[in-house]
Amino acid sequence: MEEKQIMAFRDEEGNKVEFEVVAKIYLGEKNKKEYIVLSPVEGNGDEADDFVFRVDKVNDSVEYNLVEDDEEFRLVKKEYKKLLY
């Protein structure tokens, strides 16, 4: 059984919120971009509660940036649904 990968972030009020990485998605043919789909650990399991982050490599570190562009978000969710069904 695969171990769950948990990530923690702070919300607007500074509270720690934990998320499970439910999928890693790679888009693009030449320069593949990596994305992760996160689901709240304390959530109800509803896919609508999922968040999509782009994994950006900056210098020698990794940044997780929330995908806010509608088209980019739609493409990632489309690939995620392919994994589910």
From Swiss-Prot:
Among InterPro entries, the record links this protein to: UPF0473
Cross-referenced Pfam families, in alphabetical order?
DUF1292
Against NCBIfam families, the record matches this protein to: PRK13678.2-1
HAMAP family linked: UPF0473 (MF_01448)
Sequence similarity? Belongs to the UPF0473 family.
| Record's protein name | UPF0473 protein CPE1618
Task: State the organism of origin.
Answer: Clostridium perfringens (strain 13 / Type A)
Lineage, broadest ranks? Bacteria, Bacillati, Bacillota, Clostridia, Eubacteriales
